Amino acid sequence: KIKILILSFLILNSAAFASDERLLKDNFLKSSLGLSEVPMHSYIILKDDIEDGVEKILKDTYHLPVIKYWKSGNKVSFILEAIGKHEFITTGFMVEDNKISDAKVLVYRVNYGFEIKYDMFINQIKGNSMKDSKKLVKRIANISGATLSVNSMRKLSKLSLYLYSKI
């Protein structure tokens, strides 16, 4: 009986977490695009030159073969993920006119390095653009104890700008 009770509790909590995560993503998309409803998404298929560009930015392959994006006018929002130290960091980026207008850490699954969620860090990303295909215009400062998470955010910032240029 206790095993069944524990298993039921775990299943219910994982379903609640999934719906909370979906709500966070939807709220980011509506807010960043300035809409009352989440628009239909489109896909960027990671193949050929796009896949090569993604691999150069991430120094690895992206974990999915396609990346979803949501568009409203010249605003494009992406929900992107990267591994921090051990777990995925789920982020939202909105790019407009080749600049990151909005960024947010939606789900942070690690116990340390969580400082990247705060405005003090995120504000370094907002307004950033790319000098060339490799560097951001504004430097993103490191956070002691969160180096891997900061590096992931740098890569995802570059990735969002790169993907925007391919739409």
Region spans (language model):
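Sec-dependent N-terminal signal peptides
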Residues: I4-L12
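Flexible, solvent-exposed loop/hinge segments and secondary-structure transition points
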Residues: A18-I140, T147, N151, K155, ...
